[in-house]
A protein has these predicted regions:
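Active-site beta-to-alpha loop of glycosyltransferases that engages the nucleotide-sugar donor
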Residues: 1-15, 32, 244, 420-431
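Catalytic-site signature of metal-activated, phosphate-bearing donor transferases
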Residues: 63-70, 83, 87-213, 217, ...
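Conserved donor nucleotide-binding strand/loop of the catalytic core
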Residues: 39-68, 72
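Residue at a conserved register position within TPR or TPR-like alpha-solenoid repeats
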Residues: 202, 240, 274, 319-320, ...
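A conserved acidic beta->alpha catalytic loop
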Residues: 16, 29-41, 58-59, 451-453
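Cell-envelope/extracellular polymer assembly enzymes that use nucleotide-activated donors
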Residues: 25, 414-419, 447
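Short, acidic, metal-binding catalytic loop of nucleotide-sugar glycosyltransferases
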Residues: 15-24, 28, 434-446
């Protein structure tokens, strides 16, 4: 870790890490703090009785100073965690059970994900390359890398000292622009990486025309890594949309597939815009071509999750109504309800389902859909959900209240007591009891059933 004036955030960051990892030693490099960051760090680890050291380095650039930080910590542990002072871990992160690789890449982000090498063999020598958006490079032979998947993510913070500067991204863009031309003149491939992150910084500073210029350079001209070219196309699609250029927006969204046929974000974003423009035939043509996509592509740069969580099927379910492909449209809607974890898309599909009532009632497997709707209806204010639920309830009522198989009566002390009231409606009483018997997963735990008439 390298720090400068992080007194306002460093304890929060260290507390967050301590929830997930037990450290044997720590090395943090300070590059000129004037707010007492160094003493806060020393006192924190002293209170935990964890040995370590603060190292002072003069600031030059990220690649240089991160390399100095690695050298300061070299060989003082078996493995080294690299972490920024304002980042935070979330979810259920666990360290590898067996350390089989020299480099482990950790997951960043939730809605948009990417991986970075953050956990490395500290008996090997490493360095960072680049003045900004630097990358890790081994200085000696290493035993491969491994992506650490799991139910966790690291949030890249925006509360550190550097993020306080409102001109941060503008300054970054100029640094990267100058670095690009310097490396280009020297004939170094590092220039291509600088071009991509120059585009990123122009985009983050809301300089749209400059961002388009540099993303276009990456997408159309430079021999960048295919992931950078893919993402550049998606960004160009979004930026041209902001400028009101529909044709170029769609062009670059679709061009993305030239660089990675496994990723579908560009195609799905194009379909979303085409659907809104009532170009339904094009939506369905694209859906037929790409519908057998991989729902969980790995090892991608800046992956948008929403296109893999039902957004593609949502567009197809609407466009299919206009292209007389209702069976396919209904299957898309059904797939969303049964499979997606995206609550926004799932809630939106209920309005679409109103146009598929005939298909819904004819669906022989709609009981599974009813159970899912039952589990979420109390969390939704969408009246369309209640309409669909009522239709499915009427359709499956006989299945829900059919006479169940008997259960064994236990002769034990009564611990679980279930009571009912009834009033001259034996038929309704039977339906209630039968529905409980059919759907309570732990009904065997009921010791005594009691009815007051």
């Amino acid at each position: 870790m390298i720090v400068k004036n992080e007194a306002h955030v460093i304890v929060t960051t260290l507390d967050n890490l301590a929830k997930y990892i037990t450290f044997d030693y720590w090395v943090i490099c300070d590059t000129g703090s004037t707010d007492g960051t160094q003493d806060i760090i020393r006192k924190y680890f002293a209170s935990k009785e964890i040995p370590g050291e603060i190292v002072q380095h003069e600031w030059q650039d990220f690649g240089h100073n991160r390399t100095l930080s690695l050298r300061a910590g070299y060989n003082k542990s078996d493995y080294l965690l690299i972490f920024d002072a304002d980042d935070s871990m979330h979810g259920n992160f666990t360290l590898p059970v067996k350390w089989t690789h020299d480099c482990y890449l950790l997951k960043f982000g939730s809605g948009m994900t990417y991986y970075r090498p953050q956990l490395i063999n500290n008996r090997k020598k490493w360095m960072y390359v680049g003045v900004l958006h630097e990358y890790l490079k081994a200085e000696e032979p290493v035993n491969g890398e491994c992506y650490l998947d799991g139910d966790y993510f690291i949030d890249s913070g925006k509360t550190g000292d550097r993020s306080k500067d409102p001109q941060k991204y503008q300054k970054d863009a100029q640094i990267l622009k100058a670095a690009y031309y310097k490396e280009k003149e020297a004939g170094n491939d590092l220039a291509n990486r600088y071009a991509f992150y120059c585009a990123q910084s122009f985009k983050d500073s809301n300089q749209v025309d400059d961002a388009i210029e540099w993303y276009t350079l990456v997408a159309d001209t430079l021999p960048n890594w295919v992931q950078e070219r893919y993402y550049s196309c998606v960004m160009l699609g979004q930026l041209y949309e902001r400028k009101g250029n529909f044709e170029k927006s769609i062009y670059y969204f679709l061009k993305s597939s030239e660089f990675d046929s496994e990723r579908i974000e560009g195609v799905v974003f194009a379909c979303d815009r085409l659907r809104r423009a009532n170009m339904h035939q094009l939506v369905m043509m694209l859906y037929h071509k790409y519908k057998n996509y991989n729902p969980d592509p790995k090892n991608k740069l800046f992956l948008f999750r929403e296109p893999y969580e039902g957004l593609f099927e949502y567009s197809a379910s609407i466009s299919a109504l206009n292209t007389k492909e209702k069976p396919l449209g209904f299957s898309c809607a059904r797939k969303i309800i049964l499979g997606t974890t995206n609550d926004n898309i799932k809630n939106a599909i209920f309005d679409v389902l109103r146009f598929y009532i005939h298909e819904l009632l004819d669906d022989i497997d709609s009981l599974d859909m009813f159970y899912i709707l039952t589990s979420i209806i109390h969390t939704s204010s969408n009246p369309a959900l209640a309409t669909i639920w009522n239709l499915l309830f009427k359709k499956h009522k006989n299945d829900l209240i059919k006479t169940p198989k008997p259960i064994k009566v236990k002769s034990t002390t009564v611990e679980v007591f279930l009571s009912f009231t009834s009033c001259k409606r034996l038929d309704l009483f039977e339906q209630t009891v039968n529905s409980i018997m059919n759907h309570f997963l732990d009904k065997e735990k009921i010791d005594y059933w009691f009815c007051v008439d």
